[in-house]
Amino acid sequence: MSTSSSALSQLKNSPLAGNINYEPTVWSRADALKVNENDPTTTQPLVSADFPVMSDTVFIWDTMPLRELDGTVVSVNGWSVILTLTADRHPDDPQYLDANGRYDIKRDWEDRHGRARMCYWYSRTGKDWIFGGRVMAEGVSPTTREWAGTPILLNDKGDIDLYYTCVTPGAAIAKVRGRIVTSDQGVELKDFTQVKKLFEADGTYYQTEAQNSSWNFRDPSPFIDPNDGKLYMVFEGNVAGERGSHTVGAAELGPVPPGHEDVGGARFQVGCIGLAVAKDLSGEEWEILPPLVTAVGVNDQTERPHYIFQDGKYYLFTISHKFTYAEGLEGPDGVYGFVGEHLFGPYRPMNASGLVLGNPPEQPFQTYSHCVMPNGLVTSFIDSVPTDGEDYRIGGTEAPTVRIVLKGDRSFVQEEYDYGYIPAMKDVQLS
């Protein structure tokens, strides 16, 4: 049985969301053909190869600022807090020494995902981050990998819900509750001891491991809909169906120009932005809903989706890679976005193509895992920056922050700031 985006459009009487009736927005091949990697208004400034490193002992990548459910980035008692996916560097480990006994940082960096742990950092300045350590002690998380999610400050008592991804074996959206304690000297995240798995891919809307061994299901980002006041969550998924069974039909093609009708093996790229709704604001019980955006025949990854609510519009951002595009399409590593007037859509690709902020062609892998904040600031990490010839320098550290301006369906890169500059939008004083 073949699967297409249109197969997901159906009336659903949701026990938690009520009677809903929406069709996923299709990010079409015609949309993606408009991607322009050389547009300066959607291109991140070049990162210098002499960038500073925030730690000599750990790599960091996906960065998750502490925030509230409306997206506001917060500090607590004057301390800004970020969480990062983190892995130890191994400069003295024989496993990562080359034939000449030199540290092979490239191989160490490439292996990081298998040992990813959630760690936290704190700062008085919104930069100059101080390493706090692990969020969860070893053995608390039920799987071998701790992958990205969202830390939510719940109240002025310091309670925090960390939504994250439990990976290997399987992949599940999970939550763990703890608290933040501050002093004049620093910050502690404490009591993150009881992990609750919330849901896994269902095989009806979202592809499972049984349907595709290289499936994607991760990156929870909860939020309160400013219109109906309910708690929802977006996440990365793939459209359900056996690998290779999907159809790239007329909707997925869009109005392509002559010569672009042949899609080759594009049926294998089936990314989507998923949606779930909570029973109540406690976030303890969730129901999976159909995807909001599908990318069948366009791209296989729609990582770390998240919202900004501005001027009565829903700005839905995601990140994706050059290498996950389908055959016949090309785009940079970076931020992609969709905008609409209602949570359930329909959405329009921003800047006509979907591209919001891409790496420059001369440094295609300089940054990744961007997070767009409500103040327009965008944080990311440095992956690799070219140096001499074909060589490059590994990052594993925070990239320079940039600001984008949103105007209707369009976006513009406007300013660049210091490395890892993630200022709070509001300070919460604990009671």
From Swiss-Prot:
Sucrose hydrolase activity is negatively affected by salt concentration. The levan polymerization rate is constant regardless of sucrose concentration. GO terms for biological process: carbohydrate utilization. The record marks 219 as: Transition state stabilizer. Keywords: Carbohydrate metabolism, Glycosyltransferase, Transferase. Gene3D superfamilies: Glycosyl hydrolase domain, family 43. The active site is at residues 62, 303. It comes from the Bacteria. InterPro entries: Glyco_hydro_68, Glyco_hydro_beta-prop_sf. Sucrose binds at residues 61-62, 148, 218-219. GO terms for molecular function: levansucrase activity. It is an enzyme of class 2 (transferase). It catalyses: [6)-beta-D-fructofuranosyl-(2->](n) alpha-D-glucopyranoside + sucrose = [6)-beta-D-fructofuranosyl-(2->](n+1) alpha-D-glucopyranoside + D-glucose. Its EC number is 2.4.1.10. Induction: Highly expressed at the end of the exponential phase of growth. For sucrose hydrolase activity, shows the maximal activity in the 5-7 pH range, while the activity decreases at pH values lower that 5 and higher than 8. Levan polymerization occurs mainly at pH 5.0. Highly thermostable. At pH 5.0, sucrose hydrolase activity progressively increases with temperature until 55 degrees Celsius and then falls quickly. At ph 7.0, the sucrose hydrolase activity increases rapidly passing from 4 to 15 degrees Celsius and remains constant up to 55 degrees Celsius. Homodimer. Strain KL103 contains two functional levansucrases, Lscbeta and Lscgamma. A third copy, lscalpha, is non-coding because of a premature stop codon. Lscbeta and Lscgamma show different sucrose splitting and polymerization properties, and differential expression, suggesting two distinct roles in the physiology of the bacterium. Catalyzes the synthesis of levan, a fructose polymer, by transferring the fructosyl moiety from sucrose to a growing acceptor molecule. Also displays sucrose hydrolase activity. Belongs to the glycosyl hydrolase 68 family. This is Levansucrase Lscbeta.
